[in-house]
């Protein structure tokens, strides 16, 4: 007499043999990395004020502001790098006898600082050699931007003169 478990096992094997071959299906999966370059700054306003010197007869210090960061995401094709340029709009200027300077302090692996530049209407390299990277999204992630109002000669400063300039940072292929 055949035991019930053995009978069921034999029946299952017989059904598999009678059912024919096991069928399968395939799916082609296509994955593509889109080309994009995104950039933002963490602050929309920077204020630089020339204040009185600490002692009478002294020269005022050049005001600076390092509270803004440029954040970017940039996958690149093999052999391609990107850069960040900076310029101000036509008609913008610094106060009389002053220049607006900008320096980017770049985190490791996120490009190379071009050093301190003098802002003008001509776009200048601020960060170069940006490969595939994402700088992060927290308030202090990315390339730290230091704006400095450099005083040329104190004798040419105009008291109460105020200028507002729109600085455009552009992330583009090198």
Question: How would you name each of these model-derived features?
Answer:
Residues 22-112, 116-119, 124-174:
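N-terminal small/polar-rich segments of proteins
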Residues 10-17:
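Bacterial N-terminal signal peptides
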Residues 1-10:
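Bacterial N-terminal signal peptides that target proteins for export
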